[in-house]
Amino acid sequence: QTWPPVEGRPSCKRCGACTRMWPPEANRCVCDDIVPQCHEGCSKCEKVDTRSGKPLYQCQSFEYYNCAA
């Protein structure tokens, strides 16, 4: 089975829950980052209520990310 190369994945500063696959490159995670716009491949983008007044979003589906170490 193949998966996307790490370099081509959306970046995520705070990866939350992840699958436990081997090798590690096969893992998919939920990104806990709150951003102005979800990445193109996100299949479940949810609006997050914040006090800033600006619309912010979080991708809540398991996706392939380039997680910050």
Swiss-Prot record:
Site positions (Reactive bond for trypsin): R20, M21
Keyword tags: Disulfide bond, Protease inhibitor, Serine protease inhibitor
InterPro entries with a match to the protein in the record: Bowman-Birk_prot_inh (IPR035995), Prot_inh_BBI (IPR000877)
Coiled coil spans: none
GO molecular function: serine-type endopeptidase inhibitor activity
Tissue: Expressed in bulb (at protein level).
Keyword Acetylation assigned: no
Gene Ontology cellular component annotations, sorted alphabetically: extracellular region
Origin superkingdom: Eukaryota
Name of a matching Pfam family: Bowman-Birk_leg
Disulphide bridges, residue numbers: C12-C31, C18-C29, C38-C45, C42-C59
Homology family: Belongs to the Bowman-Birk serine protease inhibitor family.
Function: Serine protease inhibitor.
Protein's UniProt name: Bowman-Birk type proteinase inhibitor A2
